[in-house]
Amino acid sequence: MKTQQFFKGLNTINALLLLTLAFFTFLMARITAAYMPYNTDVGFLRIKQDYIDIDHWRIAFFVHVYASMLVLLAGFTQFSSKIQDYYPRLHRAFGYVYVTDVLLITGPAGLLMGVYANGGLPSKISFVTLAIGWITFTAIALAKAKSGDFAAHRRFMIRSYALTLSAVTLRAWKWTITNSVELPPMDVYRAVAWLGWVPNIIAAELLLRSHYLRKRR
């Protein structure tokens, strides 16, 4: 009965958003599968051969790649009011998976990887800032939930997930740029280091502002 009510309650926009997120999660799963079980001569790692023998970097990379899939999957369940209404325990369980993964696994691994980013200082600053912002927003979201301020919890989860989606948008920007203009690969890398997450957080803030303004009318 709950399942039937859940699907009846989904409107077209929500259903399309969930399908879009599921599609991008599937694409990320395909990218991740290329590194399994332990492939160091594929994709991104081909430009990181100088670092592949550094134990802590290599461990951080594979931890980040594999654990990121959990973050994407757990994260996109957090913004459906229907899941919250009909399956509150599932919502909380996935929420704890998401928060634990970001705060203890994927976030710290991403921070370490940012220190070793290609493209010099601009790229390093971008990826380190991204990791710190991701961890910070997620930690605040958890604190707000524990204090019972669920409106603030939702706002910070939106910010956190906007940064989670940088894994997808970075690759989308890279594909768009490389198929539109001819630039040196490292220039593209520096550009997408920022484009991968800055527009996401701007979009999240615009979404939050518009929602806040609608509620005040």
What do the predicted segments below correspond to?
Residues 1-217:
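Alpha-helical membrane insertion/targeting regions
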